[in-house]
Amino acid sequence: MKTADELLEGTFISNKKGFGFVRVDGIDYDFFIPANKTRGAFHDDKVLIRPLDESEMYGERRNRRRSGTVKKLSEASVEKILERGLKTVVGVYQKNKKFGFVIPDNSRIDSDIFIPGRFENGAKSGDRVVVELTSYGDKVRSAEGKIIEVIGDYTDPLTDVLSVVRELKIPYEFPEEVTADLKRIPDEVDPRELATRTDLRDLVTVTIDGEDAKDLDDAITLYEENGMYKLGVHIADVSHYVTENSPLDKEALNRGTSCYLVDKVIPMLPEKLSNGICSLNAGKDRLTLSCLMDIDKNGNIVSHKICESVINVNERMTYTAVSAIVEDRDPETMERYSELVPLFDLMLEVSDLLREKRRQRGSIDFDFDESKIVVEDGKVSYIGAYERRRSNGIIEDFMLAANETIAEDYFWQELPFEYRVHEAPDAEKVKQLGVLISKFGFYFKASRDNVHPKEFQKLIDSISGSECENMVSRMTLRTMKQAKYSTECTGHFGLACRYYCHFTSPIRRYPDLMIHRIIKENIRGKLNDNRQKHYNAILPKICDDNSKKERRAESAEREVEKLKKVEYMSEHVGEVFQGVISGVNNRGIFVELENTVEGFVSVADMYDDFYCYSEEEYAMIGETGHNKYSIGDKVTVKVAKTDKLTKSIDFVIKMKEGEESHGKGKRRQAHRK
């Protein structure tokens, strides 16, 4: 337990209202920083904090802590700013006569940035810009900066992606040294390399990906022999071309992962590699790292071999085509791929076995709608729920099997390695989830200090097909901790497995590339004591960096998706949609539409009654008419307005009579404990 005299180092997370939080590595909760104790800290600063004792806390928060509603020692004061986290800020410029302000895109930054006229760099009002901070402000003065890049008009959809990329400091263009390094990369496989590898070109080999995918980094072989399924997962040997500490390798580490931003991809590796020599294109000899598994009729992986190999893909398949065969039995598709139909049927058979094996041990399979966003000529033309077909699951099952097999192999060899780990959820969050889902008649078992993933699996099974399936699945997912990379093999809670790593996507993930390098050195007998010491020294930092870069990419993907949804709904203001209440707080109601777009209904716009938020029922309840809006309720809403600056969509609820509530007057909000 941390004492109030102990100083801790962490990252400051600001809030528009002036207060903030500090996240400290190794502590599973954030420290609340009152507005009068931030010491001028700016969002993302590295700070030194001192936990407060009860006597230093504001009365209401002190009482809440005594009652157990907040964690002990969860409040602190900033004692020192160690390092400024943000050097630049992205936002929209508003020009006055002799100066201007930039309204930050990041809603956590609690003040606009003052721009002296001489530093506007040709920006016009309404331009989205990048500002270099020259002063971080204080209690009386705003932060100050100078404009170093004009991205474009904030209403232009083409500026959306670039603004998010600049805000999160995601590398966009490849530096010159990387371009120069590409000159050594061949267009075809060197025939001399083939002699040293296991030749698998005679096996019928397929890739299965989305229609638009170009970076094909995994291929599958499968056949039966001596009562065993012979499953081969073949992964592009990226490490053969991206050598350690080369410019390509350093830039790949810097990026950490490819970033998929709706209709644009920011790749981890240049196209010459990702779409060229490393992509497992049909009819081309390709260097691979293969995990060859023998699976019995009960779905047990009884033996395996990991080897450097060469393959030649027979057919580049799509999820749509494979599903048309194994699910729809579409005559035309089956005729076209008649020679491969038995292979796909066998794949489905083995996939079902592997999936059932995971289900028996308690692996959690979340099934909620993801968004499919179609962009045509720079504008969003369609948003809807992404249809997940059985063929997606086939590839997922095979990749999981390879990842687990590789991780277990290297764990028992006691070699330095990068694992993918997922810790059990926090007991308090599990308790809160249990209370929430009980309102919908669902329950799951959890002891005070322990919960098994199988209980979550049972919950997901119990809500399958129900109207609240999508919503409860999301609530359950939010209860989980984030998976991360680690040198310690501590298991994966969500998959209910002891050993796990990321092996199958080295074109788009650096951790996969990292362990390919280790595996190949081990296969070749070059992983001697010195090399093991080398990896033991560098892997902890690389794991931490990979985890941070993954979170950065996920943030970018979320932000761009928000922007595209706002852009799309701005064309539908005034239109009526069906939705489900996905969240409630004292400010209003969140509603998710059938097309996966989420918007907000402010309690101030609910004129038919005086509404109070009930914490006990997670509902907004009318005081006079007894109207009640709870999570999971179906509602009809009208799109009231959208705002690209705040990335927000506002709805108003249509009343039961088919009319939206009207009228004016003072709205009263209250808490019902």
Describe every region a protein language model picked out.
Residues M1-G232, S239-D285, S323, A619-M620, ...:
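Charge-lined substrate channels and their catalytic hotspots, especially those that engage the 3′ end
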Residues Y29-P34, I109-I115, V597-S614, G665:
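A short macromolecule-binding patch
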